[in-house]
Amino acid sequence: MGAQPPTNSRSPANGRGAVSGSILKTESLSIHFGGLAALSQVNFQALGGEIRAIIGPNGAGKSTFFNCLTGVLRPTSGRIIFDGQEITGLRSNAISQKGIARSYQITNILPNATVFENVRIAAQSRRHSWNMVAHHNALADINQKAEMALNAVGLLGKAREYASNLSHGEQRNLEIGIALATEPKLLCLDEPTAGMSQAETEETKQLVRRIAKNLTILIVEHDMQVVMELCHRITVLHYGAILAEGTPEEIQNNPKVLEVYLKT
């Protein structure tokens, strides 16, 4: 994560509305790889409508936590409750159907497909069944959802371009558009500003603020300025366990957090 402790230059989550009740909860969530506890007894709760950061040094368990939430990994023990239903151990496609979507640390798009095709494939994945009578209406609905997702991330004007022709920042935002096309209630963003220029980072922060009006967002992010400016609350992981939770102001003044960051 680097040696810089969390700092704050502005109030967090500028322009954000109020949060609501719990949409995601984990109870004693643990996962072991041999004798290594990648996550240990993680009790976590995210509220509807909030932007929530998961931070910590490299190897703290951040990506493992996302992998458990999205069905990439099956927890060794514990429970995951999403929108009132237990989803522990479900496969990724089933969790996506429940309303959880994810972007990845490494850009995960189809470079030889158009921008529109990338998003349309994701929109189509939400269809449970097909029949000849409904086929035409279903296609129109899928296309409309794809256009809405592209409009949300500012890429509708580049819908017919090949994804490989987009800038790095645009490709990262396309991945967010792909996630939005699945109509999630919870969006997990893994390093959304990684490798971006300052201008691209600012555009992505504005994008996250816009889309957060309609869903809950969890962010794993190494750029502490991004975290402090965007998020309502922050959870700090260290060696697979929760070290601290709180507002940006509380986290940046937490002695335990400062000690961990200054030692990395």
Model-identified regions with their sequence ranges:
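Glycine-rich phosphate-binding loops of nucleotide-dependent enzymes
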Residues: 2, 12-264
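Cationic, low-complexity basic patches in intrinsically disordered or flexible, solvent-exposed regions
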Residues: 5
